Regions:
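N-terminal export/assembly segments and adjacent metallocofactor-ligating motifs
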Residues: 1-316, 524, 529-531, 630, ...
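Flexible loop/turn segments at secondary-structure boundaries
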Residues: 34-37, 47, 56, 131-135, ...
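N-terminal leader/propeptide and maturation segments of large enzyme subunits in energy/redox metabolism
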Residues: 85-103, 254-365, 464-493, 610-760, ...
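Glycine-rich phosphate/diphosphate-binding loops that line cofactor/substrate pockets in enzymes
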Residues: 105-121, 175-183, 343, 366-383, ...
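A glycine-rich phosphate-binding loop feature that marks nucleotide/adenosyl-phosphate handling sites
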Residues: 129, 262-265, 369-370, 386-389, ...
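Extended redox/cofactor-interaction regions of prokaryotic respiratory oxidoreductases
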Residues: 136-214, 240, 318, 323, ...
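Glycine/threonine-rich phosphate-binding loop and adjacent beta-strand/alpha-helix elements that clamp
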Residues: 176, 586-616, 626, 903-905
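Long, contiguous, secondary-structure-rich segments that constitute the structural scaffold
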Residues: 610-613, 617, 621-683, 807-825, ...
Length: 973
């Protein structure tokens, strides 16, 4: 007879009658989605984790990662003690001695204090997927170092920059597809775990309502597996497809003319006088002394009825979108939309077929389908609103065609212009911030570009002084660049220089290489938080590991001092001079702030917190607390009172009492402000704010009035509300930039047409002139331009699996059972042509390196592409795993064939493998060949490295490993 009891009873059946059962709410951090969770404890131990049904983001849904968070606590990779490298030991040998936190703080305070007193840029702080950039950026600014960035530069900065410089918002935290009302979704280059639970919920509802889902991706896994249509595409050719779609929509007359005229710069007249320093700029009837961060309404249309130029948005005007005209002084002009039409004429579906591999007829059909739905199936909601020109509207009209895209589109050296093309495609269909289209999430939309600016020269970095500007910003023209008098970079990673002018997230992937090369200057101390830069978060991993341990002729490390803060032993911690043990997300206070990357919904701002459900293990300390402590010891202005005394007791006290300016009422958290918690978004500090968040599911959700929820780029009510609550500086319209005058300003500088302003160094002028095109264009990824495509005929990709987040989870005993090691997925036709068997050993090789791995046949990948999971392969002994674990013996890391730099140019200059506009790392540009491994070769993945030793404080006992599998079970006597 079958046993009827459940397969798994988390609380067990034989409970001690005195057992203390409690449930606590907090926010997950098993990926960047940040769902609400409920953690059940028995006698202080975690028993199981559930989704919180009262949380607006995931509504109770939880994924495999989230439910396995309990394993974080029992991982044998947990770091529990501050560690100092033993004298005489080499980096990478993991030879450490335990020290106290007081010793660790003394070491940091002494070293960083000397740096700040002499040359603050000698300290560099780079952080991974930490979700606390408001704090880390504040620390860097007050320290006075420009050398700060988070992981965005090697993740998806092209997505952020390409969209924000075009529509004032972007996908992911700041916007997304309105699948509640959309009828057609086109998803491009999105990993199968992206925005995990909320996107799964939305897709499920969308499909049940009859929506059509089309996936454009070289690989059909994850979300693509449930798509109604999979359109396989060659990696790095997305821009060609998007430009061909724009061409076809214009050819078929399916663009939304009224929307473009009213809400974009499509009808604005562009100066075409090649001899003018204003060539390519919009014609203005007056020039205000400072345009600030918004588009002043001082440009011109050519009116159809009057047949002459008039001010934009003149009541009753009907401007041309097409045509060529001359001003009274003879200046030739065209509407920006005409320039777009001229540009895309060459980008036909037939042309795109030869580049993308997508049949021309498919491209035509896709364009027709999205254009017809956007035009003929509009949605009208009875929501009255007023635009910024004073026009009152009785309803909101939507075009129910939506898009979603992420890193697969962004992580190419041509990604910025591809994403500009995507943004323009969305715009000409009339889908920006409308029902069924793309919708913003607070604090966006913001002006184009947003207002924060970096320093502009070396004089803005001074000893014992906060940075004069923000560490990261949004340049509007060449004068905003952070360069010296010769036009050379001031930042270590060369962000905001002529090499990468719009590197709005920095270039973390360049930090170690540049510090090792001492280019543009040597640094003293590099602090890496929560980033595995000696393994999966770096390109050409073996060389970077060598750089970290490299010494000069005097026997001194080329990177003199390296601090690593992390919760787990990793490939990176072994190289540290000082290791700081961080807590897990279940052991600390944390906030997803409106000042950073909140979890807002379409209907209004949402922020959230983490509340500790467990005490820290061993001597772990939250990195936030470390920054508060060091900032206080160094007497950084934001962390001390005027008399130099400590201002904040700890991190929770800092979050409660910090204001962006004295009396501003704007802090890290928007909920329950005011002395009694009666105010929202803006108000005095509330001493019980954390307590109120804890009582309210650790989340604050402010629902905007219905009249503020759409058309926010031009919604007067919303913009005034956003200005009042410091989410935008101006309550001015944020028109869509079909034509980017910002890019044209950089191009003019490269052409010598920036009188009295900055010009790029000679070696970079052609580069700037080429890539800073005000209209999107297609070019091959830079690596493809430099590769022998006959020798390396294939593209290679990595993506995150649904059950693991980068390198975080191979030490997670439950998730290991889903992904223990990875294969290289190859189309059977491609593999068989190379005589490679399914499950057989093979080599994958690029001009940068080669890897031996296992092959897995897959029909779900286009024949010209091979791919694998990211970061499943581990170095032997890392992450508390057995040295012979499958992760290191069979698993592999594709990064070994990806270069962080391209071959030097004729002048011997090093060129980063990055987008020339933003510095986005070109992860998916690598070209490879594959071939069968010799049958006599040992059956092990290559390359291999020396076995990494466990670090002091790690519990790698058999008991610990047993707990790692059976955590959550009932206690045994």
């Amino acid at each position: 007879m079958l046993d009827a009891k459940p397969l798994h009873d988390p609380l067990g059946r034989e409970l001690d009658s005195n057992a203390r059962i409690e449930t606590k709410n907090t926010t997950c951090y098993m990926c960047a989605c940040r769902c609400g969770i409920r953690v059940t404890l028995r006698d202080g131990d975690v028993r199981y984790i559930q989704g919180n049904p009262d949380h607006p983001l995931n509504k109770g849904v939880i994924c495999a990662k989230g439910a396995s968070g309990i394993m974080k606590q029992y991982s044998p990779a947990r770091l529990t003690k501050p560690l100092r490298r033993k004298p005489g030991a080499d980096r990478g040998d993991a030879e450490f001695e335990e020290i106290s936190w007081d010793e660790a703080f003394d070491i940091m305070a002494d070293r960083l204090g000397q740096i700040r007193e002499t040359d603050p840029k000698q300290f560099a702080l780079f952080t991974g997927r930490d979700q606390m950039q408001a704090l880390t950026g504040l620390f860097a600014k007050n320290f006075g170092t420009p050398n700060y960035a988070a992981h965005g530069g090697f993740c998806s900065v092209n997505m952020a920059a390409g969209m924000i410089y075009t529509i004032g918002g972007s996908f992911w935290e700041f916007g997304g597809p309105d699948l509640d009302r959309s009828k057609l979704l086109i998803m491009i280059g999105t990993a199968e775990d992206h925005h995990s639970n909320p996107l799964k919920i939305a897709l499920s509802k969308f499909k049940r309502q009859g929506g059509k889902f089309i996936s454009v991706n070289p690989v059909r896994t994850g979300y693509s597996a449930i798509a109604d249509e999979w359109v396989p595409i060659k990696p790095g050719t997305d821009g060609a497809l998007l430009l061909a779609l724009i061409n076809e929509i214009i050819t078929q007359g399916l663009y939304d003319r009224e929307y473009l005229v009213q809400y974009s710069n499509a009808a604005e007249l562009v100066n075409l006088d090649d001899n003018s320093t204003e060539q390519g700029m919009f014609v203005r009837f007056e020039v205000p002394p400072d345009e600030g961060c918004f588009d002043p309404q001082n440009k011109l249309w050519w009116d159809r009825e009057l047949n002459k130029p008039i001010s934009t948005h003149t009541p009753g005007a009907d401007p041309f979108l097409l045509g060529e005209f001359k001003l009274e002084d003879g200046t030739p002009v065209k509407p920006a939309f005409q320039l777009l039409v001229d540009r895309v004429k060459e980008y036909t579906p037939q042309w795109a077929e030869g580049i993308t591999g997508i049949p021309a007829e498919t491209i035509k059909r896709l364009a027709h389908e999205m254009g017809i739905i956007a035009r003929d199936e509009k949605i009208e909601l009875p929501i009255a609103w007023t635009d910024t020109w004073g026009n009152e509207h009785e309803s909101v009209t939507g075009s129910p065609v939506s898009f979603h895209a992420m890193r697969g589109l962004a992580a190419h050296s041509n990604g910025f212009q591809s994403i500009r093309a995507l943004s323009i495609l969305m715009s000409i269909l009339g889908t920006i911030d409308v029902p069924g289209g793309f919708r913003h999430k607070a604090p966006f939309p913001r002006p184009i570009p947003p207002c924060p600016k970096t320093p502009t020269g070396p004089a803005d970095v001074q000893p014992n002084t906060p940075l004069n500007g923000m560490p990261l910003g949004w340049p509007a023209d060449p004068d905003d660049l952070f360069v010296d008098e010769q036009g050379e970079p001031v930042r270590l990673d060369k962000a905001f220089s002529w090499e990468y002018p719009l590197a709005v997230h920095g270039l973390m992937h360049n930090a170690i290489t540049n510090a090792w090369r001492q280019d543009p200057y040597p640094i003293d101390t590099l602090l890496i938080f929560m980033a595995n830069m000696a393994w999966n978060s770096t390109m050409n991993t073996a060389e970077v590991r060598t750089m970290l341990n490299d010494k000069d002729d005097n026997g001194e490390y080329k990177i003199p001092f390296l601090i690593v803060a992390d919760a787990f032993q990793s490939e990176m911690t072994a190289y540290a001079d000082l290791v700081l043990p961080d807590t897990t997300y279940l052991e600390r206070h944390d906030c997803m702030s409106m000042l950073d990357r909140p979890i807002s919904e379409f209907d209004g701002p949402v922020d959230s917190v983490r509340i500790p459900v467990l005490p820290p293990k061993g001597d772990c300390k939250p990195f936030q607390e470390v920054l508060i402590e060091i900032g206080s010891r160094l007497k950084l202005p934001v962390f001390v009172n005027e008399d130099g005394s400590r201002k904040y007791r700890d991190y929770p006290d800092f979050v409660t009492n910090f204001e962006t300016a004295p009396g501003s009422g704007i802090g890290f958290l928007a909920g329950w402000r005011g002395t009694g918690g009666e105010k929202f978004m803006k108000g005095e500090p509330n001493p019980k704010q954390w307590e109120m968040y804890e009582k309210n599911n650790c989340v604050f959700h402010y629902e905007l009035p219905k009249s503020y929820q759409y058309m926010r780029n031009w919604n007067q009510g919303y913009l005034e509300w956003a200005q009042k609550h410091s989410m935008t500086r101006y309550a001015e319209p944020i028109n869509l930039h079909i034509y980017s005058e910002i890019l044209q300003k950089f191009r003019l500088a490269a052409q010598g047409k920036n009188p009295g302003g900055r010009v790029p160094p000679k070696r970079l002028r052609k580069r700037i002139e080429t890539y800073f095109d005000p209209l999107p264009f297609y070019y091959q990824p830079l690596e493809a331009q430099l590769s022998d495509l006959h020798k390396y005929p294939l593209n290679a990709l990595t993506q995150r699996p649904m059950a693991m987040y980068h390198s975080w989870d191979s030490q997670n005993a439950w998730l290991r059972q889903i992904h223990t090691y990875n294969f290289l997925h190859v189309n059977p036709k491609t593999a068989q042509a190379a005589d490679i068997e399914d499950g057989g050993w093979m080599w994958i090789e690029s001009m940068h390196g080669k890897v031996r791995c296992l092959c897995r046949y897959s029909e779900a990948v286009e024949p010209g592409t091979v791919w694998t999971w990211n970061a499943i392969g581990k170095a032997s002994g890392a992450w508390g795993l057995d040295p012979d674990a499958n992760e290191s013996r069979k698993g592999f890391l594709l990064n070994h064939v990806i270069g962080e730099e391209l071959p030097p140019n004729e002048a011997g200059e090093h060129i980063s493998n990055s987008d020339p506009v933003t510095g986005q790392a070109g992860w998916y540009d690598v070209r490879v060949r594959i071939y069968k491994a010799d049958k006599n070769e040992p059956e092990i993945s290559l390359p291999q490295f020396d076995v990494q030793k466990p670090e002091p404080g790690q519990d790698i006992s058999k008991k610990s490993r047993w707990l790692a599998y059976f955590a959550g079970g009932k206690k045994r006597s």
